[in-house]
Amino acid sequence: MMRFLSMPTAACCCVCVAVVAPAHAEADAPPVATGDSVLTLGKVQAASPLAVGSSARNVFSSVDILGGDLLQDQQVDNTALLLLRAPGVQVTQFKMGVEGGRFSFRGFNGEGRINAVKLLIDGIPSNDNNGAMPYLDAVFPLEIAALEIVRGTNDPCYGLNAIAGSVEVLTRSGGNDGHASVTVGSFGTREVQALQGIEHGGWSQNYFAAWRDSDGYRDHDDARKRAFAGKWFYTDPDARWRAGLSARYYDDAALEAGYLDAATAQSAPRSSPYYARDDRSARQIGQVGLHLDARLSDTVQSSTTLYWNRYQNRRWVRFTAASVQQERDTDETQRGFLSKLSWVPQVDWAESFALEGGVDGQWQDSTSQRYRTVARVRTMPLRDWDFDLHTRGAYVQAVLRPSARLQLVPGYRVDWVGGQFRDLSSGARYPTYAYGTIRQPKLSAVYKLTEQTSAYANIGRSFQIGSGNGAYRTQARNLGPSFNDGWETGVKFVGAQQRWDARVAYWEQRASDEVATIFGVNGSVGTGEVGNVGKTLRRGWDAQLNLHPNERWMLWLAYSRQRALIETPDPSAPMTRGKEIENVPHFLASAGVDWQATSRLKLSAWGNAQGDYYVERSNTLGRYGGYALANLGASWDLGAQREISVQLKNLTDRHYVYVWYDSGSSGQSPGDGRALYVTLSWGW
C-alpha cells in the first residue's frame, strides 16, 4: 500500500470531519455559499471569462493572491524580492551578479539545493532544469497584475517542480491606457518602466519595456537589466473563443562583488574581496507562448498553451580565496504544452458538480559546461554535459458540492520522465532512472461552519527527481523519485462586510529519499550534481490577518513557524539524524499598513523578518541569517494621472547577511543598507 494511505491520522480525521459535519449543521442553518481558503490582499484585475482551469479558489490549501497595487510601485533589485510581501515565503538573497535571489516556502530553502516551487508566468512553466526561477526577473513590478501563491501538495495541475506548491505571475492584459515611471535612488540606481494597452473591437495588445541600471550597494556590484514583453490577443465577437501570442525577452549583465568571510562582512560589508575582481555574469532569457481558450458548449470549456523557453547564463565566479575561479555556462531550451478541459453539467444529485482533466508535456535540451579559469581565461575543463529531459503528465479532478456548505475536490495526477545524458568529456551516455509511472493522489475538503467561518483540510502527494545528471542512471542501482506526502488543516475567517479576513493552518510534509544539489564551490571535477539527504519531515503553522476597515486603511500581518528535520539520514552522514536542514529559519513574518491620509497623500509602512538558520546538516557551525527590516513609503498625487513617490528601505540600516556552507567552504553576502528611492510616475 502506498505510504500516502498511511498519512497521519489527524489529516484523515480532518477530511472526514468535513465530510460528516453537514448532518447537524444543515438542519439548524439556512443554506449558504460554499467557503474557500483563499486570502486576497490588494486589487486584482478581473480575468477573461474564457480563462479556464483550476482557479486558485478551488485549491483548498494556503492560497494567497496579492494584487498588483501592492507590487507595482515597489523598488527591488530582483523580482523575487516582491515575494517578501507574501505570507510564509522565504527569500534567499544571494546578491551576486545575475543571481539576485530565490524564494521558497514550506520548510524548503531558496539556496538552490532543492527548488521546490513551480513558477508560471501567464500560465507558462518558468523553472529551469534544476527548478530555479531565472525567468522571474524578466517580469518587472509595473507589469504585474497579481501574484497567486499556492502552498501545499494537493493541487493536481502541476507535477515537476511543484514539490511544495506553485506561484503564478499574472501580467496586465487589455485596456486602453498607458503607464510609465522613472526612478532614481541610492547606490546609483536608475530605472525606467513603461507599458501600453490597446483594445479595439476583438483585438487587444499590450506592450512593456523596462531598463534598470545600478552601481550596487557593494564595490564591484554594477548591474544593467533590460526587459521587453508583448501580448497580442483576439476574442471572437460571440465570445466563444480567444487566441493570442505572448513574448518576452530579458537581458542582464552584472559584476559580482564576491562572498566575504564573517569578520569582513561585519566590519566592511560594502567591500569586495580582491579575489572577486574578475567575477561577473550575464544572462539572456526568451519566452514565447501561443494561447487558445474556447467555450465548446454551454457546459464545456478548454484551454491550451504552447510555449518555448530559452535560458542562457554565463558566470565567472570564485567563491573563496582558497578556491579557484570557474566559468559556468548554461544553455537550455524548453518546448512544451498544457491543455485542460472542464465540464460543468447540471445535476440533480448534488448542489453542483464539475469535472476537469488536463495533459501537459515538456522537452528540455540543456548543455552545462564548467572550466577552471584565471582572469576569465580558461585553463582546464571541469564539465561538458549535454542532456535532454522530457516529462509528460495528466490529471483529473472533480469539484463536488454535495450540500450548500460542503465542497470536496478529489484529484489524481500521473507523470512520466525520460531522457538521455551525455558526458561529452568521456563519451559516456546514460538514460534517466526508471522512475515508471509517478502516481500522486490528492484530496481536499472545505466546510462552511458559519457565514464568516470555513474549515478546510487537504492531503496530497508531490514528487522530486534529481537535477543535472542527478536524474540519470550513472550507477548500477536504480533510484525512484522522492515522494513528498503532505497534509494541512486550517480555518478561514471573514469579518462583517468583508472588512477583515484571517486564516490559521497547520501543515506537514514527509519526503522519502530526498536529494539536494551540490554547489561544487571548490572547482574540482565533480561526478555528481546531487547528494542524498534521506527521509525528512517538514512541519509548521501559519497565522494571517488582513484588515481593510474602510477605503482609507489597509493592514496585513502574517507569521509562520517551520521546522525541517532529517529523520533517517543518508548512510554516509549518520551524524545528521534528527538534525535540521540547512538555511531554513524557524520563523517568517511580514506586516504592513497603507493609509490614504488625504485625497492626495498616501503613507505606507511595511517590513519583514526571519529567524536564524543552521548552514549545514550536522548543525555544529552555528546559526546565521536572521533579520528584521522596516520600510517607509509616501506618495503624492500631482493630478492629471501624475504621482511622485518616495521609499525608504531598511529604515534602521540593519546589518544582515546571507550565509552558505558547502564542501568545507563558507561565505557571506551582506544585504543592502539604508536606501532612498524617488519615483515619478504618470498615466494616460
Language-model-detected regions and their locations in the chain:
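Short acidic/polar hinge/loop motifs at secondary-structure boundaries
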Residues: 124-151, 169-171
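Short, acidic, small-residue-rich periplasmic hinge/interaction motif at the N-terminus
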Residues: 27-72, 293-295
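Transmembrane beta-barrel wall of Gram-negative outer-membrane proteins
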Residues: 186-213, 218-257, 280-297, 301, ...
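Membrane-embedded beta-barrel scaffold of Gram-negative outer-membrane proteins
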Residues: 291, 301-317, 448, 454-460, ...
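Extracytoplasmic beta-strand/coil segments of soluble accessory domains associated
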Residues: 47-55, 60, 80-124, 128
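C-terminal beta-signal and adjacent terminal beta-strands/loops
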Residues: 609-616, 635-684
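Structural signature of Gram-negative outer-membrane beta-barrels, strongest in the C-terminal barrel
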Residues: 344-362, 382-511, 548-550, 560, ...
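Gram-negative outer-membrane beta-barrel transporters
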Residues: 341-343, 404-408, 416, 508-510, ...
